Amino acid sequence: MTGRVTSVRGPVLDIRVEGPLPAIGDVVEVGSLPVVAEIQAHLGAADVRAIALHSTQGIARGETVRTTGGPLRVPTGPAVLGRLLDVAGRPADLGPPIPAEAPRAPILHPAPPLAAQDARFQVFSTGIKVLDLLAPLAQGGKTAMFGGAGVGKTVLVMELIRAMVSGYDGISVFAGVGERSREGHEMLGEMKASGVLDRTVLVYGQMNEPPGARWRVPLTALTIAEGFRDGEGRNVLLLIDNVFRFVQAGAEVSGLLGRMPSRVGYQPTLETEVAALQERIASVGRASVTAIEAVYVPADDFTDPAVTAISAHVDSTVVLSRQLAAEGIYPAIDPLATTSVLLDPAVVGEEHARVAGRLKEAIEHYHELRDVIALLGIEELGREEQLMVGRARKLQRFLTQPFFVAAAYTGMEGRSVPVAETVQGCAAILAGECDDWDEGSLYMIGTLAEARAREEARRRKGAA
């Protein structure tokens, strides 16, 4: 079937179709490039409205339109490994075209039925101390990292990609949604340099692209991840940076289509769109898709409707703190606001859950006393409270860690720490084994043994 463009208003195309109308969600190809557009509304017996997924520059009234007979289909499987793709699955890395025989799958389809999903919890170990201790990640689950601008979300996502590729026989799929072109270029270069690109797929819909591309690129990446899970039986780590930009693009599309906005200007279908993405992320059979999602928090407002809609779907919530980042605590993860459904004795073990609970209590008690310390000085506290404050500060510093992906900027080699070492180190600090240590000995190290060696070296230097 063919048709003609009757109106062009930015990324919104009105089309007159010859023959039966294409279904809502089907894509059409416009012009000779071609520009891909998704049908969003039926305006009459022969007229439809579509949102372009590529730039409409050069498209004019009267342009030929070809229907495809279904939703957007993107390539999946081994042929896309090591490639940078756009929202339509086209190569964007100047490499060869994707082979025609590569399997393709539609980006719009329902979530797996509940009966097919594996609801058992398995912990995905990252080697990042504060995450493994306080917010264990669920394999086949969803983790959201909430934070404002400049607190370290993207660096944390990149470190998790490295952890997946180096520690697991799995595939990573990265969706760059509405982020800067510079960041995408840097990530591609760093992955090539570190040798992890051959087990990674990058799918970009960046901030200079039309809202339709930014709106659909997470579904393109998820479809590719599902292809590896269902077709290859591989475990997949899906990283989305940034889910807030997906919601933002949906609001732009909603406004372009003339829908009445809801709270704070968001689209009336906010909850539906977020659920359509999140509910497809699941374990099926023996393979899983594990999602790590960076979520920008506008103006650090955690009551924003987009933030609350996303947080309702995740198993682990990681909150990045601007105050901790200002204090030089990296990763700047707030131990009190960070939670996980896996932090349960039945899943992580009695000792792990006990140490995590005691650590949170110590840091919370320290926060309660900070105003008193600022006004009167720590000397005004009792002996026991001084010890607790010292231990809380040491725990904060012990949970800092140099990242492999940031080594070029920090000059410090990255560290990956087993969960057992993290639990053991925190238990020792809580028990008072490090009460007479300098806080600096625990800053930006891996295990407690490394901190002990640094403390002994400091003392030898002081004695000399």
Swiss-Prot record:
Protein EC: 7.1.2.2
Alphabetical list of InterPro entries matching this protein: AAA+_ATPase, ATP-synt_VA_C, ATP_synth_F1_bsu, ATPase_alpha/beta_chains, ATPase_F1/V1/A1_a/bsu_N, ATPase_F1/V1/A1_a/bsu_N_sf, ATPase_F1/V1/A1_a/bsu_nucl-bd, ATPase_F1/V1_b/a_C
Residues binding ATP: 147-154
Keyword Translocase part of the UniProt annotation: yes
Topology of the protein relative to the lipid bilayer: Peripheral membrane protein
Subcellular location: Cell inner membrane
Function: Produces ATP from ADP in the presence of a proton gradient across the membrane. The catalytic sites are hosted primarily by the beta subunits.
Subunit composition and interactions: F-type ATPases have 2 components, CF(1) - the catalytic core - and CF(0) - the membrane proton channel. CF(1) has five subunits: alpha(3), beta(3), gamma(1), delta(1), epsilon(1). CF(0) has four main subunits: a(1), b(1), b'(1) and c(9-12).
Protein name, per record: ATP synthase subunit beta 2
